[in-house]
Amino acid sequence: MEDRQNDQNDDVFSFFSPSFSAATPSTLFNRSAYSSSSSSGDDESQPSVDDSNKRIDYMIQFLDRRLSEDGNHDGIGDGNGSDSLPEFVGKCGESGIFKVPIRSAVHPNRPPSLDVRPHPLRETQIGRFLRTMTSTERQLWTGGEDGALRVWEFSELYGSGRGLEVEDTAPYKESLGNEFGSAAVVCMIGDEGSRVVWSGHRDGRIRCWRLRGDHGIEEALSWQAHRGPVLSIAISAYGDIWSGSEGGALKVWPWDGALGKSLSLKMEERHMAALAVERSYIDPRNMVSANGFANTLTSDVTFLVSDHTRARVWSASPLTFAIWDARTRDLIKVFNIDGQLENRPENSVYPDFGSEEEGKMKVTASKKEKAQSSLGFFQRSRNAIMGAADAVRRAATKGGFCDDSRKTEAIVISVDGMIWTGSSNGILMRWDGNGNCLQEFAYESSGILCMFTFCSRLWVGYSNGTVQVWDLEGKLLGGWVAHSGPVIKMAIGAGYLFTLANHGGIRGWNVTSPGPLDNVLRAELAGKEFLYSRIENLKILAGTWNVGEGRASTDSLVSWLGCAATGVEIVVVGLQEVEMGAGVLAMSAAKETVGLEGSPLGQWWLDMIGKTLDEGSSFVRVGSRQLAGLLICVWVRHDLKPHVGDVDAAAVPCGFGRAIGNKGAVGVRLRMYDRVLCFVNCHFAAHLEAVNRRNADFDHVYRTMTFSRQSSSLNAGVAGASFGVTMPRGGNALGVNTIEARPELSEADMVIFLGDFNYRLDDITYDETRDFISQRCFDWLREKDQLHTEMEAGNVFQGMREAIIRFPPTYKFERHQAGLAGYDSGEKKRIPAWCDRILYRDNKKHLGAECSLDCPVVSSISQYDACMEVTDSDHKPVRCVFSVKIARVDESVRRQEYGNIINSNKKIKVLLGELSKVPETIVSTNNIILQNQDSTILRITNKSEKNIAFFKIICEGQSKIEEDGQAHDHRARGSFGFPQWLEVSPGTGTIKPNQIAEVSVHLEDFPTVEEFVDGVAQNSWCEDTRDKEVILVLVVHGRFSTETRKHRIRVRHCPRGGPAKNHFNDGTKTSGQINALHRSDYHQLSNTLDVVEQLKNLHSP
């Protein structure tokens, strides 16, 4: 983990990185349909003139740097210019936690990424962070805290953002947010059948969205679904929408009811339709309340996933799971995270079936019983009370409180019908479709926040920003740090796995990664660095002063900072001993325990320094932190503020018991031009002989300083609170790869330490020191400096740099006594010393390194001195001016270059051609006729010799067959769901090479249709008895490819007792085409009716 980076290379570390080149070859999505060059508009198909001019500017700058290199390697300094001061460099900075973090144009320890939305500054996202994401065939959709939706067309992924919300983001369309009272988007799901996206919101509403070309995003339908927030949403194999909320609330919105009809209405007609949809839901809990399960279904429904393999729906809370039949909405099983069945009431009349039987059982009542089981007010109240009592009972049984580290945080279903759940302790669990836990895996102790499956792979996103890739057998294929923050959502499209980070950044990763494509793409992209990188130049003024509990005059502040701030872009000020005393220290410790910071005296200092810097006109304060007598603050120029953000603060006490703030450090971290800069103000142990304690103080600060958002009134409004994701550390589990995390300071591109380090002069007397000072023989004095001695030995400030000191020692003076005669002349006659220092570390691995994406932050020192004329304290203030070069990436140009490589590179084209193959498959029939609860076997043969085929069966729509035998009134179904009278099992699956898969196509007798109002069945009527026809589509994928082979199978439903028409509506001869395999060819399994009869017999006399 020693190469963790910030977001350009983005806080990347080599968590788990097998050789990409040695990975198994895989199939990539066909991107030709999505490349930016396929767009019809000229603005979309060609890079803009501005982008071309940028490339020219970057190339010229690159050539200028190369031409000037020859003259920059002389002298003691680091080669950043003739005005740079020579520097002293500490030892032992080449390894361990003091090693410079790895940076490069394309990081070597992770696959190249497509930055769809580069990491935005947190301060620009307050109240509008992206929180969820889904994809359709041609778009990537996201939802935010403000209720707004953003949509990226896959055809524009490589395009320029042209000054949108985030400058370097890919082009996108956006809906309106809070302007129209919309609440935060909590969950989303794409519906390919209806070509819409459904979203659940914090205000309890479900909304339906369409993309209308140039008109942007249109809200097609909206209704109040729940009283509380819509926490989860799923679409079943039958096209019904399932939604979950707080307190176990679960509702089903049938596609065959008002929902499906409403989408075909005109906009002005949809208001009344929304009212009908709102009342058309089914509450599946009402249908099972009598059997004893409902009392366990009281936890928030945080997850809903549709099992298309078995036509089921899984609902989940953090600790329990429930499995439902997607067609009948009957409850099948309830169990907890240990796989144990939830207890039913002791007086339950129902038997306790074994785990195998549980997989087949469907606890239900007959349709007649359902209609009669409408619950009145008292019955529902009784159930609520019983549910609460049962929850208390179960909590008491389990010890009252659950282990938060075991909570379920993500759940997905893979194409082979296996269910995968991830918990907050990093444990990944594999379940079969009947709810039996098969295996547990753990390779990472950080919490799992999201997962995604497609064909043969499973992707897992963690709270530490890591993404792992697994196969469906549980084998770990690779992993890397995808973002600098938690990965909260995933989606797939256009050949990429898209990951959404908690900070709002979106990246696309090749679905074959780790794979052979990565090395080619990495080399090509790195070779074009000069086209998309540029150098920014700025100056930083850092000042430190131990103020000795005093207050400075305006003249002193102007002398120290006012003049030096001219021409600098960033000012960092660290103060020590702002206030001391036992009472102050005790109060500070008490405040820290409750999250309070700052003091009136600290605020006075900030205001006075702000006035000196002309705060408000020239500078703006971006961050500060106070711990007892330690205070640090950072100001930046107004014109630089748009490029500065993600400001965090930290404090580390080093006083008594590492708990009191009389000694310690405070720090501020910020991100500028996508690089991380840290500023740390320290006050270490005093006294001449306490060298080891000072070294230990530094080591403690360096290793333990952890930054967090600021809450202090000293920085009000700078970094407000927002919807966040915690990053649980989780205990180690068996098999977890445990690698010691690098300190946060180790990951910064530049760290500046300033403060009263308290290092003194050794082996010299007071009088000798005064003589050397009067003669300005600082070279002799530096040989006695404890800090340089310890740095030379590699004991402290390892690998850090300091300009050669050419000013008198800054401690200790008599207050208000000018000149060098002011040194302590009292009884103690403390030996003068350079206690007040400023040191730094940038990205340079060696002296003379040039600024580039491999070494993105390079600094030198142009001024390092003390203000000897200031007499307000027993210490003199010290200041240092840094000349900093920062290499930054133009993500818009880089994204275009990425697209050019993908679409034109010959090696990549050859790889794609070899890898993007779909196995050849054949089906046993193209036409099926069903009647009288018929069942037919559809056989699918994989003719490939070596490649696995992945299939899914969908329904394109349903038609009515008229007397002439022709299909009419074709209607699409939501999410390509099956009609209620048809059961297809399995709906998804895998077929090994040269193997055959059998799919059961079964006619379910469904003579009546019920109308539900407010969750209760109200009316029923006979179903239309005319013949029906559906078009089933068998969609076959290769291992990774969305390029597909499709087979269409016509399935005709004839009413019971009616004649079977032997002609189809395609106008072709059908004799010899119909190949309906009858029930004798099908092994009949027990069904719902069998279980119902068994249950009814239990009550028979």
From Swiss-Prot:
Predominantly expressed in interfascicular fibers and vascular bundles. Expressed in seedlings, stems, roots and flowers. Expressed at lower level in mature leaves. Residues 31-54 are annotated as: Disordered. One of its GO terms (biological process) is phosphatidylinositol dephosphorylation. Residues 31-40 have a biased composition (Low complexity). Optimum pH is 6.5 with Ins(1,4,5)P3 as substrate, 7.5 with PtdIns(3,4,5)P3 as substrate, and 6.5-8.5 with PtdIns(4,5)P2 as substrate. Coiled coil: none annotated. WD repeats lie at residues 121-162, 180-219, 225-263, 403-432, 433-481, 483-519. Pfam families: Beta-prop_IP5PC_F, Exo_endo_phos2, Ig-like_IP5PC_F. The keyword Ubl conjugation applies. Residues 749-765 are annotated as: Catalytic 1. Keywords: Hydrolase, Isopeptide bond, Magnesium, Metal-binding, Repeat, Ubl conjugation, WD repeat. There is a cross-link at K907 (Glycyl lysine isopeptide (Lys-Gly) (interchain with G-Cter in ubiquitin)). Optimum temperature is 22 degrees Celsius with Ins(1,4,5)P3 as substrate, and 22-37 degrees Celsius with PtdIns(4,5)P2 and PtdIns(3,4,5)P3 as substrates. It comes from the Eukaryota. Has phosphatase activity toward PtdIns(4,5)P2, PtdIns(3,4,5)P3 and Ins(1,4,5)P3. Has a higher substrate affinity toward PtdIns(4,5)P2. Required for secondary wall synthesis and actin organization in fiber cells. PANTHER family: INOSITOL 5-PHOSPHATASE, TYPE II INOSITOL 1,4,5-TRISPHOSPHATE 5-PHOSPHATASE. This is Type II inositol polyphosphate 5-phosphatase 15. It comes from Arabidopsis thaliana (Mouse-ear cress). The gene is IP5P15.
